[in-house]
Amino acid sequence: MKRVLLCVLLTAAACLAQSSTSSTVIIQNVTVIDATGAPAKPHQTVIVSEGKIEAIDSSGGGFGGKLSGTQVDGTGKFLIPGLWDMHVHMVFGDWFPHGKEITLPLFVANGITGVRDMGGELEVLQQWRKEIAAGTLIGPRIVMSGPMLDGPKPRFPSSIAVKTPEDGRRAVDDLKRRGADFIKLQSLIPRDALFAIA
């Protein structure tokens, strides 16, 4: 039951933060786990303003006066830093047809606030990233490679074939121009092309 309540708390906070980035959310009496190895800190008040944690204090006593904003009761619940899934493929041909409608909100509901897409359709992912930033789509922060680079006979249809050093440099330049955050390489790239890419 506590897991369900935590998911509801995280989803509610994410929805509130995305629906109006100028709003303030105050989570009171929550147990904070900061993931540094320090013991859990019970009875904390966390203030989130414009999508960022502004302050954490025990019982809100250090804030002085009445706190204004959307109040969330964290009694019996835990608050942790957002998690990252460092290897996902959200748009990969027709393998994951419901990524936008199902997968993105499920990431957030399960505490995943950031993902690294390791090979997918760059333009689709960029559109999702814009919608998430605008608050019209619930989902995690996305960093993406776009199509993977592979050797002369790629294993996946969406991969970019690299035969020569020139192919490699051209592919990297093109992905950079199109907005890729990083480049993912597969294992079939010829040695000379690999060094040109590096």
Residue spans for each PLM region:
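Metal-associated gating/positioning segment near the N- to mid-region
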Residues: 77-136, 152-156, 160-166, 192
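Active-site gating/metal-coordination segments in enzymes
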Residues: 151-198
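Boundary at the C-terminal end of the N-terminal hydrophobic targeting segment
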Residues: 17-22
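Histidine-rich, glycine-flanked metal-binding segment
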Residues: 36-80
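Bacterial N-terminal signal peptides
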Residues: 4-15
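Short helix-capping segments at alpha-helix termini
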Residues: 63-64, 132-140
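Divalent metal-dependent hydrolysis catalytic cores, especially in the metallo-beta-lactamase
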Residues: 103-123, 140-147, 176-188, 198
